[in-house]
Amino acid sequence: MAISRGAKVRIKRPESYWFNEVGTVASIDTSGIRYPVVVRFEKVNYTGIDGTDGGVNTNNFSEAELELA
């Protein structure tokens, strides 16, 4: 799989908030960690603090959980 920084990818992890959404690869860690690919999304998830418009718009995935969009 030829995933590189800046590539558009679709998320295939069923339990992810961003399942089947498209995001942009922000970075790839080559040190051997379990989820080396950081993906950035346009929308935020539901983990914002009560009363604020915020949340997380990045998450780590393994290459097996991604497909090029």
Swiss-Prot record:
Signal peptide residue numbers: none
Topology of this chain in the membrane: Peripheral membrane protein
Main location per the UniProt record: membrane
GO biological process, one term: photosynthesis
A Gene Ontology term for the protein's cellular component: photosystem I reaction center
Keyword annotations: Membrane, Photosynthesis, Photosystem I, Thylakoid
Coiled coil: none
Similarity annotation: Belongs to the PsaE family.
Cited function: Stabilizes the interaction between PsaC and the PSI core, assists the docking of the ferredoxin to PSI and interacts with ferredoxin-NADP oxidoreductase.
Protein name: Photosystem I reaction center subunit IV
Chain's gene name: psaE
